[in-house]
Amino acid sequence: VSLEDYTAFSSRFTSTAGATGKGTASLRKAFSSANVIDLFILESATDTQLQKASISFKNDLLAAIDIKKMITDDVVVNDGLIRTVDLVITASVDKRFEGIEGTITPQIARKVQNYFLSTNRDFGEPLILADLNRVIFELSDVRYASVDNLDKDIHIEFNEIIQLNNLVINISLV
């Protein structure tokens, strides 16, 4: 059983209450705890948001893993960390959209929200601004876009996941 197996199992697991979540596995690096597997878990709150896993979810997960794990492995369930991000995006569009800019804003919002869906993000995955811009540029009406409130990419630890909190979209006519 590999760490990838534990990660896949925890991310596909459904509790007795029907809850799902997302997880990642890590092996402790101390000689005395060489067979201790740390699972970092978050439970799905909605289709777009994760939350700290409930005790019942963790208990169900541990019980399900206990049947599948190697006998020498000791699995410990920990809470994953959610790093929320607020974004202010300015998108430049052609002047021909003057008066109807409001039709482009929801399209951009949908693209950004899909980018941050919990099914599209992984633990330890950084927020690369160029990738986010690339997603926005898939809209043919957008000439240019920038994230105004971030100067650089956001890098996180292996047990953290980035989640969108607030989104503000400004439209600039060019």
Q: For each of these PLM feature ranges, what is it?
A:
Residues 80, 86, 92, 118, ...:
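Immediate N-terminus of the mature polypeptide
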Residues 111-155:
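C-terminal structured "cap/appendage" subdomains that terminate the fold
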Residues 31-34, 137-140, 162:
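A structural signal for short secondary-structure junctions
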